[in-house]
Amino acid sequence: MTAHVRPTDAKKLIKGATGNWEVVIGMEIHAQVSSNAKLFSGASTAFGGPPNDHVSLVDAAMPGMLPVINKECVAQAVRTGLGLRAQINLRSTFDRKNYFYPDLPQGYQISQYKSPIVGEGEVIVDLLDGESFVVGIERLHLEQDAGKSIHDLSPTLSFVDLNRSGVALMEIVSRPDLRSSEEARAYVTKLRSILRYLGTCDGDMEKGNLRADVNVSVRRPGEPLGTRCEIKNVNSIRFIGQAIEVEARRQIEILEDGGVIDQETRLFDPNKGETRSMRSKEEAHDYRYFPDPDLLPLVLHADFVEELKSHLPELPDEKKARFIADYGLSPYDASVLVAERDTADYFEQVAKGRDGKAAANFVINELFGRLNKDGKDVITSPVSPAQVAAIVDLIGEGVISSKIAKDLFEIVYTEGGDPRVLVEERGLKQVTDTGAIEKVVDEIIAANPDKVAQVQAKPTMLGWFVGQAMKASGGKANPQALNDILKRKLGI
């Protein structure tokens, strides 16, 4: 895959005291592999167990214990590489990354330095304004996670929990192709969506399933790359955006004051809204990488890769294109619906056999709006796809108006029930009897002669009469019939 260079976008430049600056961002995403067992042992990867409950002798680095590769972790890495349109390397190797820390019992981390399992790929990212851009993927490699040091249980002691030690991670390294905090957030959101579609990572940042190291530098437009600082272990998409903004501003202020940027690793403090120095940024030679003598090169057969490829699910980009073609959706609506696999599946159940646009409008505007208000998603939704589909059908058949549909949806959401039965039981059918509608209109016209004169001079005031008639009919008047009668009676 050929490298590409993004042209400077004037809209994304940051204004400094002495002129404009361009921020350049690269990401290293640590995605926990969805697997029942760890990368080199059979210990469980279950989240939330008692401390040191999921630790094998291999994880604890007991003498004489040798690592054995977990085939499912390898398969998950290959699936991810295929989903990123990346090169799958049939031969890769494991290396020891040497550093000392209490929660790293081996004294080194098994990783892939020289020969990763996945090479160059790409992610296509869509922004809310309709802009799309490509983020190049430099590599994906497998590595072990470390344990967890706990410092707040005692004023004098630190504790180590090795439950996470040895859990398989995929480190997905992007090229420095991002040019704003908005782009970085959109990239991580899209990457997480791809991983979830593939089933290779849960992407739950609250549980540490997905963590980001964010590399930030600034430069004058058109100049060479500046010195980068790495912001370590950012654990939410919102914090990623905030960390980039404050770090870019920090670097700009230093450079404009005549200072220089030190290449270092920093931490983001969301409470103070600042980054602070953690340590000088290590280079590869600081880790003294060398091939792990306990692990043979990982050699894959092409048939193995092809078998995995043949069973890949439909991914967000392909699903979005299909939704646009098959259901006539706008690119924006299609993007919203395919952002999560569960959401896309829910929509397709609603849209099956009926107007796709009408289904999308109701799902996005009514269902998602209500779920977001309550902090729920389609998995925990109290309204089933069949119930939403029934409401969409009732609107399409002219049985209820769009306004009544909102009220009906609220009843189904809070109380449950069959929408068609509820319409009958609660008298929610819209009034299509033109005689009844004319009676309501006549009463409103008779009571408001001043408004009649105004609407005849200014036809846009018709909406006031529509609102009064809808109010008088309890929202049940057929909108088209009502509009026709009003225009005829008012002579407009």
Swiss-Prot record:
Residue ranges the record marks as coiled coil: none
The record, for NCBIfam families, names: gatB, PRK05477.1-2, PRK05477.1-4, PRK05477.1-5
Q: What is the source species?
A: Azorhizobium caulinodans (strain ATCC 43989 / DSM 5975 / JCM 20966 / LMG 6465 / NBRC 14845 / NCIMB 13405 / ORS 571)
Task: Specify whether Nucleus is a keyword of the entry.
Answer: no
Reply yes or no: does the keyword Cell inner membrane apply. no
Keywords, comma-separated and alphabetical: ATP-binding, Ligase, Nucleotide-binding, Protein biosynthesis
Read off the Gene3D superfamilies from this record: 1.10.10.410, GatB domain, N-terminal subdomain
Which pairs of positions does the record mark as disulfide bonds? none
Source taxon at top rank: Bacteria
Q: What does this protein do?
A: Allows the formation of correctly charged Asn-tRNA(Asn) or Gln-tRNA(Gln) through the transamidation of misacylated Asp-tRNA(Asn) or Glu-tRNA(Gln) in organisms which lack either or both of asparaginyl-tRNA or glutaminyl-tRNA synthetases. The reaction takes place in the presence of glutamine and ATP through an activated phospho-Asp-tRNA(Asn) or phospho-Glu-tRNA(Gln).
Name of this chain's protein? Aspartyl/glutamyl-tRNA(Asn/Gln) amidotransferase subunit B
Gene field: gatB
